[in-house]
Curated annotation (Swiss-Prot):
Subunit structure: Associates with the pre-60S ribosomal particle. Interacts (via WD repeats) with uL18. Interacts (via UBL domain) with MDN1 (via VWFA/MIDAS domain).
Disulfide bonds: none
Organism name: Xenopus laevis
WD repeat start and end residues: 103-142, 145-184, 189-234, 236-273, 311-357, 361-400, 403-442, 445-476
Function of the molecule: Plays a role in regulating the expression of CDKN1A and several members of the Wnt pathway, probably via its effects on Notch activity. Required for normal embryogenesis. Plays a role in regulating Notch activity.
Segments of this protein annotated with the region Ubiquitin-like (UBL) domain: 5-87
Family, as annotated: Belongs to the NLE1/RSA4 family.
PROSITE patterns referenced in this protein's UniProt entry, alphabetically: WD_REPEATS_1 (PS00678), WD_REPEATS_2 (PS50082), WD_REPEATS_REGION (PS50294)
A Gene Ontology term for the protein's cellular component: nucleolus
Domain of life per record: Eukaryota
GO biological process assignments: Notch signaling pathway; regulation of Notch signaling pathway; ribosomal large subunit assembly
Signal peptide feature range: none
Alphabetical UniProt keywords: Notch signaling pathway, Nucleus, Repeat, WD repeat
Protein name: Notchless protein homolog 1
Amino acid sequence: MKEDVGRLLIQFKNENGEGLGTPFDVPVDITPDKLQLVCNALLQEEDPVPLAFFVQDLEIVTSLDKTLEKQSVETEKVIDIIYQPQAVFKVRAVTRCTSSLEGHTEAVISVAFSPTGKYLASGSGDTTVRFWDLSTETPHFTSKGHTHWVLSIAWSPDGKKLASGCKNSQIFIWDPSTGKQIGKPLTGHSKWITWLCWEPLHLNPESRYLASASKDCTIRIWDTVMGQCQKILTSHTQSVTAVKWGGDGLLYSSSQDRTIKAWRAQDGVLCRTLQGHAHWVNTMALSTDYVLRTGAFNPADASVNPQDMSGSLEVLKEKALKRYNEVRGQGPERLVSGSDDFTLFLWAPAEEKKPLQRMTGHQALINEVLFSPDTRIIASASFDKSIKLWDGKTGKFLTSLRGHVSAVYQIAWSADSRLLVSGSSDSTLKVWDSKTKKLLIDLPGHADEVYSVDWSPDGQRVASGGKDKCLRIWRK
């Protein structure tokens, strides 16, 4: 007869450290599947969700004893096992290019799916914005009006409007269902537009207000219904590189003056200046970006043919608020910033101006940084050819994803936070698995540098664009 396997005392805890039940003993070689059964029984949820289990930040992948072997944990004491709910749906990796869409006559600078994945828009150096029909994967509308490169595009969280900003400082609003311009151009900035961001749906379901950042050192808040500038935020002394509209009523701006500023959106009062970077701040992300982008749309409810969200403004607002609160959790929104000084900083800007963590390791400037939709992982893309993953709560370094042979320009997460796609100046896209931290699929196809990449919120498609003027759509 086989000898009894050793047993250990464990205590389940959630991500905030709150205990679930009392300590109890389990076989030392217990697997994640068995832990899942025990934990679900304790949680008593009507619809159990998949869980991941961790001992001191290390995930239990095969069995508890294998995980403990890699760590110095006192096994005589009660071992805390942290359980983390995972996405209930699974996004499958894209593996092939289903369409190569021609039409732009200059480089494609930006591509973006609407919040439900119904529409795809692109902005180009040829001064046009194009809308693409995703059911047929063909060009839909070419929207003309800009007289210079379109540098930035942004979907309103209700999916009914797209804003675009160009190199000669104008902002246009477009209707994706007709490709026609809505209202007059928004004019007032004196230099080019670097970034656009709409007010979150749960704060205003009309998607009325838009924030813009410019090389002229200012941020402007626009009433897109009246076609007027409401506020001009001045305090930065150099180009503003990005602006984010947080879910708790703060606006955040990053600048080449090395600072990040937090403003009260309501009245434009400057609340905080975050300092620490030694050079230009190029990019930033909020832990709640994904839920703010998708508003009332839950990727788990996606249908085969994506549709706009239906329902009254009140219903949509409630849905968006519920989703926002679930993602935001108990702490405040976190912000991560990336700089020309090769570093990233993690902040809780609503609460304090000291950074939570300085994140070092990149060997060249940082192009883009993004939180995973579940806020647990931060991914950063750099000119050093690598993508690095960091813990979304602490900023602790997790791993480097290597495979690109040239600068990585842009990255995008899948809605379930399990996959990441990257676009590079080496002309390829690559799909990475955030759990195994490995390259899943290499996607060659572009003839030149890939400037922009996006993953549709319903998980079905990836779109990419770049120097070869072609827009490519990738599917599973």
